[in-house]
Amino acid sequence: MERTLTILKPDCVKKQLIGAVTDKIERAGFRIIAMKKTRLTKETAGEFYAVHRERPFYGELVEFMSSGPCVPMILEKENAVADFRTLIGATDPAEAAEGTVRKLYADSKGENIVHGSDSAENAAIEAGFFFSAEEVVRVN
């Protein structure tokens, strides 16, 4: 089983779409093995997205991710990373495929409802940022 990390971003929480997006995730065959509602500070958002520090959108991303609560989750499924990225769609909702999370719910490239890890290696690192081993509940 492969794992991936997702974050339901502040726009998702503000729009009261946690249930709708979580339902779509579960219907796609993912198991949620860790989940919590939290709020990132500018510092923690900056740490999480440090890989983008030199990119022009970094400041806006940190501001947005610290603007309200978010819901990180660890998901488990065969081929989890690729399947989840297909489920959520392109970063820009205008380019996302019909029926994807971002096409359905996102307003813009900057406020695009959800984060999804881009590799199994990054998923493990990102999961460790939000969850301790004790918080991960394996479902049989």
From Swiss-Prot:
One of its GO terms (biological process) is CTP biosynthetic process. SMART domains: NDK (SM00562). The active site is at 115 (pros-phosphohistidine intermediate). PROSITE patterns: NDPK_LIKE. The keyword Metal-binding applies. ATP binds at residues 9, 57, 85, 91, 102, 112. GO terms for molecular function: ATP binding; metal ion binding; nucleoside diphosphate kinase activity. The keyword ATP-binding applies. Its cofactor is Mg(2+). Disulfide bonds: none annotated. Pfam families: NDK. Keywords: ATP-binding, Cytoplasm, Kinase, Magnesium, Metal-binding, Nucleotide metabolism, Nucleotide-binding, Phosphoprotein, Transferase. Homotetramer. Belongs to the NDK family. Major role in the synthesis of nucleoside triphosphates other than ATP. The ATP gamma phosphate is transferred to the NDP beta phosphate via a ping-pong mechanism, using a phosphorylated active-site intermediate. This is Nucleoside diphosphate kinase. It comes from Chlorobium phaeobacteroides (strain DSM 266 / SMG 266 / 2430). The gene is ndk.
